[in-house]
Regions:
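Membrane-interface helix termini and inter-helical loops of multi-pass transporters
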Residues: 24-36, 64-65, 95, 144-156, ...
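Loop-to-transmembrane-helix transition segments
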Residues: 7-15, 42, 62-89, 156-164, ...
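Specific transmembrane alpha-helical segments of multi-pass solute transporters/efflux pumps
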Residues: 18-23, 55-101, 105-106, 142, ...
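Hydrophobic transmembrane alpha-helices of multi-pass small-molecule transport proteins
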Residues: 51, 116, 125-147, 276, ...
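Specific alpha-helical transmembrane segments that line the substrate/conduction pathway
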Residues: 38-49, 83, 91-124, 164, ...
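Helix-helix packing/entry segments at the starts of transmembrane helices
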Residues: 16, 42, 102-108, 174-208, ...
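Hydrophobic/aromatic residues within transmembrane alpha-helices
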Residues: 29, 39, 43, 93, ...
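Glycine-/small-residue-enriched transmembrane alpha-helix faces in small-molecule transporters
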Residues: 1-42, 81, 89, 150-190, ...
Length: 319
């Protein structure tokens, strides 16, 4: 194995935990009178502003921005606009369904990314990732199929919950190609592509622009002002912990691991969401849904065993 994948696997896990905190912040924000579109407006504006300040302050950030062509810069901006559709359907679904269920439904996307990668990106090699993908997909099916008949969620919530991973899968493949990935290899192995320090702030700017257009198109003000006092800290959290951190970490990790493998590793996200939602909001899953969560976690272990097992064991096989 050329170098260790473990740091990049951990980076994707950090991204997953960041994204997984999003539903928790949303559940704190919605009771204050803000809805999902208000949340998205502040989330992406604050995330973009904070990250642009950081990137422009860092010499490496300024150097990364100078490397990109106008065409690639516009592509990164356009990807950010596409992300609005994913974020809108996901956070919109939380109006009607539990955060734990939304987290599980989202994880249909690794299977979609894996299929798309066969045609448009670097598909996983060997049998192990595909076996792990089958296990993870089964876990998602168990999670969604374990809905209690006595607490059937609204149809619109389920429709939005299903639409989100489809849109996100397309976003991931396009972002991977922007990072230099193709059918012949990952972005890091092939070289080229937009570095994360340039791609992520441009993408966040595009997302913020897209949210503002959506707000104006629906007859709303550009920004919901004032922010309710009880929503201020959760909004800062959703902009940083559930915004800047996961978007940047996933882009950087996927550039090394490839889109399909990164998507598979990030299936640990619903584990975090489920546990945290249970501890904070008292949400509970059925035993079948818990089994689905265990299957998802096991799938990641199967897929990345070469990266996470003890170093001595790898040396024993000449790796």
């Amino acid at each position: 194995m050329r170098g260790s994948r473990l740091p990049w696997v951990l980076l994707i896990a950090i991204s997953a935990f960041g994204y997984g905190s999003g539903p928790l912040f949303a559940k704190w924000i919605y009771p204050t009178g803000f809805d999902w579109l208000d949340l998205l407006a502040w989330r992406h504006l604050l995330a973009a502003l904070i990250l642009w300040v950081v990137v422009l302050f860092l010499p490496a950030g300024r150097a990364a921005l100078r490397q990109i062509t106008p065409r690639r810069g516009l592509t990164a901006f356009g990807l950010g606009v596409l992300f609005v559709a994913n974020a809108s359907t996901y956070f919109g679904s939380l109006t009607w369904i539990d955060a734990s269920l939304a987290g599980l439904m989202t994880y249909a996307y690794p299977a979609i990314v894996a299929v798309l990668s066969i045609f448009f990106a670097h598909a996983p090699s060997g049998v192990r990732p595909w076996v792990a993908l089958a296990i993870a997909t089964s876990g998602v099916v168990l999670g969604v199929g374990g809905i209690s008949a006595g607490k059937e969620p609204a149809l619109i919530g389920l429709v939005l919950g299903v639409a989100s991973p489809i849109i996100y899968s397309c976003y991931i493949i396009l972002a991977a190609r922007l990072g230099g990935e193709s059918k012949s290899g990952t972005g890091a192995s092939r070289g080229g592509g937009i570095p994360p320090l340039a791609a992520v702030p441009l993408s966040l700017a595009g997302t913020s622009f897209g949210v503002f257009v959506l707000r104006l198109a629906t007859g709303r003000d550009l920004l919901p002002i004032p922010i309710p006092d009880d929503a201020l800290l959760p909004i800062l959290g959703v902009a940083t912990i559930a915004g800047i951190v996961p978007i940047g970490a996933f882009y950087a990790g996927a550039k090394r691991l490839g889109a399909a493998r990164a998507a598979l590793v990030s299936t640990v996200e619903p584990i975090f969401t489920i546990v945290a939602a249970g501890l904070v909001f008292g949400e509970r899953l059925t035993p079948v849904q818990l089994l689905g969560g265990a299957a998802i976690l096991g799938a990641v272990v199967v897929a990345e065993w070469e990266a996470i097992r003890p170093t001595q064991a790898r040396r024993g096989r000449g790796r």
